[in-house]
Amino acid sequence: MAKYFGTDGIRGEVANSTITVEFTQKLGNAVGSLINQKNYPKFVIVGQDTRSSGGFLKFALVSGLNAAGIDVLDLGVVPTPVVAFMTVKHRAAAGFVITASHNKFTDNGIKLFSSNGFKLDDALEEEVEDMIDGDFIYQPQFKFGSYKILANAIDEYIESIHSRFAKFVNYKGKVVVDCAHGAASHNFEALLDKFGINYVSIASNPDGLNINVGCGATCVSNIKKAVKEQKADLGISLDGDADRIIIVDENGQEIDGDGILNILAQYSDICGGTNGIVGTQMTNMSYENHYRANKIPFIRSKVGDRYVLEDLVKYGYKIGGESSGHVINLNFGTTGDGLFTAIQLLAIFSQAYKPVSEFKLQGELMQQTLINVPLTKKVAREDLQKVASDVNDVEKRLGNRGRVLLRPSGTEPVLRVMVEADDKSLATNEAEYLVEKVKQKLV
């Protein structure tokens, strides 16, 4: 079991968890030392979101890297997918993002990309963790690394997207965008300006403390309200580091990551094509049934965009994602990318002249009830055996009307209890039953 890494990097409350100046410096030094051991290029890229803690954590990371003899190129405040993109483009050994994604501003963390733009696999994470717990290493003969700032990183990213999609995007509707006061602030607007989109921007004034507060992809009520007030045709909401996207239609109705994947699957020729779709254990059964009916291969991965990516590579598919809004298209990038996904959707909406609501899967979706149960410590999968008989009882009662999923969070001491059924009250009642059993046996 990983000591520091969760499903999406390392994350926690600043100064009251792993996320301290001392740890972040050791992490930088550990990765730098590993780069030296493996004879990778002595050069990495770093970026950050808008949290007030991002600056001093970044410089702690840089100092550890520099001490190990690694040169650092700082992109400043940029979306997470921009760091992955630039890591590949500039042939860096690794890319770091100081971010806690959709979490509150008091949290922060580090996402780490390898030279191919993918998040680290479990084996490499274990190597990094072993190095963190070892000695701090200074590069011999004072051959320390350098530190430089690249101010135009977002321009390179925007130009790459524009060169691929300029001929497809001609969207005439009115768009509202919610940047979550995060890394997309001003950067997403620059991308939309490049494509000539008519938009209104909200939650795009970061002050270091307001990231994700009452806005962004985890608070869709903000974008729903704005779409109605602006009488807009489309709403696009990103999270704090812009690797997630949720959209709403002209009626203010939400289309989550599953719904977005379904739209991309229908128009995959515009998005570069794919032989199938990768969803997750959380993907609504209605979409799985829809893909099957339309002879579109569909695979469920474990929850976490790194696992979606692993299955995309394993099965040779190009498009996949999560209900939460992480959407990956390997025809362009290597990680969840809210900005690029938005442009793909605008390209699709430009080609088919109908309201956004008509792109959604028609009919009622299976009803999901998801309850997060706080725990005193992280729960291992083997701990779930304590409630296995209770889960089995619920599955028997549901029969073919639904399913059950218990999933430990990869980033916090929380157990997610999800029940899906063709009736909302049935899903809710069974989920609440399981929550009580979890509280009795695991809390």
UniProtKB/Swiss-Prot annotation:
Binds 1 Mg(2+) ion per subunit. It is an enzyme of class 5 (isomerase). The modification Phosphoserine is found at residue 101. Keywords: Isomerase, Magnesium, Metal-binding, Phosphoprotein. GO terms for cellular component: cytosol. Its cofactor is Mg(2+). The active site is at 101 (phosphoserine intermediate). One of its GO terms (biological process) is carbohydrate metabolic process. InterPro entries: A-D-PHexomutase_a/b/a-I, A-D-PHexomutase_a/b/a-I/II/III, A-D-PHexomutase_a/b/a-II, A-D-PHexomutase_a/b/a-III, A-D-PHexomutase_C, A-D-PHexomutase_C_sf, Alpha-D-phosphohexomutase_SF, GlmM_bact. Mg(2+) binds at residues 101, 239, 241, 243. One of its GO terms (molecular function) is phosphoglucosamine mutase activity. Its EC number is 5.4.2.10. Activated by phosphorylation. It catalyses: alpha-D-glucosamine 1-phosphate = D-glucosamine 6-phosphate. It comes from the Bacteria. It holds the Pfam family PGM_PMM_IV. Gene3D superfamilies: Alpha-D-Glucose-1,6-Bisphosphate, subunit A, domain 3 (3.40.120.10), Alpha-D-phosphohexomutase, C-terminal domain (3.30.310.50). The keyword Calcium does not apply. Belongs to the phosphohexose mutase family. Catalyzes the conversion of glucosamine-6-phosphate to glucosamine-1-phosphate. This is Phosphoglucosamine mutase. It comes from Francisella tularensis subsp. holarctica (strain LVS). The gene is glmM.
